[in-house]
């Protein structure tokens, strides 16, 4: 069973956290189930970048990025080579080390009322 190690982040996970995950789990759901509140303005529909994370270790064990995710990642603040949208990440067989960036951008569009 792979482990997900969330690096310390003063806003989301001040002490850092290590949680168990199953192969095939969604990374955003793993975080939320563990009490790590990663923002997700679009409810995980790959329409914003608020759930942007940087996968410091285990990146290659994740599912491949879709064209839609790559397009959204181009808009993410602090984009790095190992950046992913946590709502689109499927946990593989390896442990992950995940950094939650200090800042994010919300590109979700809401209909005017």
Curated annotation (Swiss-Prot):
GO terms for cellular component: cytosol. It comes from Haemophilus influenzae (strain ATCC 51907 / DSM 11121 / KW20 / Rd). Belongs to the adrenodoxin/putidaredoxin family. Keywords: 2Fe-2S, Electron transport, Iron, Iron-sulfur, Metal-binding, Transport. It holds the Pfam family Fer2. Its cofactor is [2Fe-2S] cluster. Ferredoxin are iron-sulfur proteins that transfer electrons in a wide variety of metabolic reactions. This is 2Fe-2S ferredoxin. Binds 1 [2Fe-2S] cluster. It comes from the Bacteria.
